[in-house]
Amino acid sequence: MSLWSDLGADLRAKQRLYSTPEQVYPLLRTVLADGTLANVLYRIQAMLVRWHLGPLALIPHWFNKVLNGCVIGVYAQFGPGLVLIHPVGVVVNSAVRGGRNVWIESSVVIGENRGQFPVLGDDIFIGSGAKVIGGVNIGTGARVGANAVVLHDVAPGDTVVGIPAKPLPRRA
């Protein structure tokens, strides 16, 4: 993917938050919202990595850390539709792989444990303060509740909560 197509998908995904009748200028609101600058800096970082300019990717990485309090590893990969709702305190390891339409709230940690790294499917939501640690797979359509600590795989479509995270019963 390209910088513009990924960033466009990110903004369209985020715009869904602001597409209500009372929002006169949802695109402007989206561009000025918390997390948009973090998304832009991450996408520039990812573009530089794709162009084999990894050392230069440290520049937007640094700006993201300083301006947004958000650390997304230089080699972390996310598909289009990434939404950083409130980026402060977000830490993502460089080896993490995420699919399309991953939504991340504030103070989320997605990181390594004993050389193992998480893999996130498509259409994932990770709530504020959640921790996703080690070689876990988060299935497509899964939701991780606020402050959950995920140490084991999450099945597609499941919602997990708690410490350690356990799935909620599915609604009939």
Task: Outline where the language-model segments fall.
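Terminal amphipathic alpha-helical/low-complexity segments used for targeting or macromolecular assembly
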Residues: 1-68, 172
